[in-house]
């Protein structure tokens, strides 16, 4: 075993099987290589050292047959899903990291430098190294049913390291390459459909899935006969490339504030590709060597380990929520009631009817509000139909399931009722008391409260055991987090039903104890509070707002404040200040902002430049103790570390991993920080504040 193979001792090897076939219309044998790790599509083929060597051996066999062409494809539904990342934590030195990059380049470029034409028949998912195999091939076809194509590496903290950064911009142009390598990857890991891949020039042809291989071979025969010559765009290596790199830098700055090394290195490699000549092996050597060096740097970076940790949280822990009771206890939901018909309630109605496909009834204080809520849902369904995502029949069926009533007696046959009204405890208690008069004893009463006590809300009910917190994040259709809060008397059947319903709604549920602010809002308000307190003391708005970009939040604190709404933030802050007065303090500046009914700190001039709203500058009184950006960052980090440890001690969540999951799914915190606790460990903040790390050494770190 080589050093790198030792690191990947547990690799599920993707084998490569060579078959020499006769193809109608092609004179001479064709070598068909199939990538297959021996499992079905739920375990995609990937490349570790073993898989790369298997492909290398398959190419030896193919070339030995003296074919007129070589084609490569994958097992059903999967072409190849990139590098095997399971061995990455075992890579401990730079030589190992360099070896992995060089091995991939050595094997893949055999397709590019082949003296006979090479074809990639992309029959299914092709991501990362999988797509790079296709890019090294001379020609590419894709099945119309291929699930996803893309280069998602920067999303995790890597770069496309087996040719992607050098080949793609020289194939489809630098601007399109920026879209695939950076813009899509950093936009929640967006991928390409086969149709879009064809439009961009990533593939040369798209065929139906039923006879994809046959059509691909027929197309290859026409290429070999000279009847088809795939077009390649002329690449602008001057201003066009300049503009693309400027856009790349803007994307990375906007998404990561340049705090994630992977995307930053990707920009550098895309710039280098300007001078890479795909017809010159020496030029390719230089470009690929730069990829090897970048990959080695990143494989040994804490940010990549944090990214893999975050990826694991989102794809594994989120699917098995800690603290969820046995799912067999969950009751079936066949009808849903929603109290409230405002924007949040209407979004909930849309989600429930779309995902559960059961009757949904809205109620509110007057018919006008109800009609508006039902109309909103119908309008959203019409939009989906207009985009071709729903057939006319399906759209009509969904619209027929949504209704409204002024009378809560209409909820008599519902199994699950959720209130989404103003954050007032007395109002919510009154609503639940009224509902108890009309619904069955086992009907779930859920609350979308963002901070109020579930236990207090249920205290006066005949059946407090069926009350549960079910806190969504806005916009409901976009943010995947759902906090499930157990009140003092919430029973296991109710809790199990809540978790099962969250899964049916395609949301990621995190269980929380019934303490003010629950998980996300408690940390959000603590963070915003530190920034606003710094401004109250005299720190300039611009300094305070930009000081904590390193934390990985997707927007600055005052931009987030405008999105949440100052009044909502103040109300939640007041709830937390009442519960934890030693750590949460109402900002006089925020109170003044709310009193003046101002919606934001920032305003924008005709030139689009962001400035402090003059009225806000006047009403927000400041002291004379200005902090530097470093001081604001330090106090915010320390506040995070302190609050998280207290929450863990209180049992708000089961583990630090759940804190990170909430921040990633509810607030879009960066993968490169693993949420927040890996970052606090990496910067030494955890130990400075709490005397210990949140995560064990080697977890989300080198």
Residue ranges and their predicted role:
Residues 77-81, 127-128, 452-453:
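Short, active-site-adjacent cap segments at secondary-structure transitions
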Residues 4-12, 16-28, 36, 58, ...:
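N-terminal glycine-rich phosphate-binding loop for ADP-containing cofactors
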Residues 120-130:
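Gly/Ser-rich catalytic serine loop of serine hydrolases
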Residues 26-53, 76:
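STAS-typified acidic loop motif
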Residues 108-120:
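Conserved catalytic cysteine-centered active-site region
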Residues 55, 60, 76-90, 108-111:
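Amphipathic alpha-helical interaction surfaces in cytosolic regulatory modules
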Residues 45-68:
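A short, well-ordered alpha-helical element
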């Amino acid at each position: 075993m080589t050093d790198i193979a030792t690191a990947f001792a547990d690799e599920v090897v993707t084998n490569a099987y060579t078959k020499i076939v006769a193809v109608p219309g092609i004179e001479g044998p064709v070598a068909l290589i199939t990538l297959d790790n021996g499992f079905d599509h739920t375990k995609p083929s990937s490349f570790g050292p073993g898989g790369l060597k298997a492909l290398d051996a398959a190419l030896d066999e193919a070339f030995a047959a003296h074919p007129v062409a070589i084609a490569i494809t994958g097992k059903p539904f999967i072409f190849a899903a990139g590098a095997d990342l399971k061995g990455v934590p075992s890579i401990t030195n730079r030589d190992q990291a360099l070896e992995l990059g060089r091995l991939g380049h050595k094997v893949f470029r055999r397709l590019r430098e082949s003296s006979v034409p090479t074809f990639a028949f992309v029959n299914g998912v092709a991501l990362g190294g999988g797509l790079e195999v296709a890019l090294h091939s001379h020609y590419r076809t894709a099945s119309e049913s291929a699930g996803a194509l893309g280069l998602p590496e920067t999303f995790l903290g890597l770069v496309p390291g087996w040719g992607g950064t050098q080949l793609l911009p020289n194939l489809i142009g630098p601007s399109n390459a920026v879209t695939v390598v950076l813009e899509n990857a950093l936009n929640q890991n967006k991928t390409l459909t086969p149709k879009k891949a064809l439009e961009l020039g990533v593939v040369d042809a798209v065929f139906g899935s039923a006879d994809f291989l046959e059509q691909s071979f027929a197309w290859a025969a026409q290429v070999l006969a000279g009847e088809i010559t795939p077009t390649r765009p002329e690449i602008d290596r001057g201003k066009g490339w300049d503009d693309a790199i400027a856009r790349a830098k803007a994307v990375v700055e906007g998404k990561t504030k340049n705090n994630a090394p992977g995307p930053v290195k990707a920009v550098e490699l895309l710039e280098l590709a300007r001078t890479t000549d795909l017809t010159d092996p020496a030029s390719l050597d230089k470009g690929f060597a730069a990829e090897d060096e970048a990959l080695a740097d990143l494989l040994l970076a804490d940010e990549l380990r944090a990214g893999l940790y975050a990826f694991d949280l989102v794809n594994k822990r989120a699917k098995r929520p800690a603290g969820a009771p046995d799912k067999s206890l969950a009751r079936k939901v066949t009808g849903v009631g929603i109290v409230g018909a405002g924007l949040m309630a209407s979004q909930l109605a849309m989600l429930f009817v779309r995902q559960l496909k059961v009757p949904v009834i809205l109620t509110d204080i007057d018919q006008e509000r109800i009609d508006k809520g039902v109309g909103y849902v119908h309008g959203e369904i019409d939009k989906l139909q207009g985009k071709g995502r729903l057939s006319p029949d399906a759209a009509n069926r969904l619209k027929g399931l949504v209704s409204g009533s002024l009378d809560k007696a209409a909820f008599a046959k519902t199994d699950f009722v959720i209130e989404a009204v103003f954050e007032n405890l007395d109002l919510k208690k009154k609503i639940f008391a009224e509902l108890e008069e009309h619904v069955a004893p086992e009907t779930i009463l859920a609350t979308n409260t963002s901070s109020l006590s579930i236990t207090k809300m249920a205290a006066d009910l005949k059946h407090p055991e069926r009350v549960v917190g079910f806190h969504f994040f806005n916009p409901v259709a976009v943010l995947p987090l759902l906090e499930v809060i157990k009140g003092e008397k919430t029973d296991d059947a109710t809790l199990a039903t809540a978790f099962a319903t969250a899964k049916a709604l395609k949301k990621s549920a995190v269980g929380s104890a019934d303490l003010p602010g629950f998980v996300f809002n408690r940390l959000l308000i603590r963070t915003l509070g530190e920034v606003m307190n710094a401004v109250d003391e005299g720190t300039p708005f611009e300094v305070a707002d930009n000081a904590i970009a390193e934390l990985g939040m997707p927007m600055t604190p005052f931009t987030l404040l405008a999105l949440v709404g100052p009044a909502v933030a103040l109300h939640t802050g007041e709830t937390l200040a009442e519960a934890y007065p030693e750590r949460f303090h109402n900002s006089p500046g925020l109170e003044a902002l709310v009193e003046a009914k101002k919606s934001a700190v920032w305003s924008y001039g005709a030139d689009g430049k962001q400035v402090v709203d003059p009225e806000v500058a006047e009403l927000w009184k400041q002291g004379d103790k200005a902090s530097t950006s470093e001081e604001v960052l330090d106090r915010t980090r320390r506040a995070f570390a302190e609050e998280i440890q207290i929450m863990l001690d209180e049992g708000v969540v089961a583990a630090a991993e759940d804190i990170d999951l909430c921040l990633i799914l509810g607030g879009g915190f960066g993968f490169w920080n693993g949420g927040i606790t890996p970052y606090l460990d990496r910067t030494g903040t955890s130990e400075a504040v709490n005397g210990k790390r949140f995560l064990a050494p080697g977890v989300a770190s080198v």
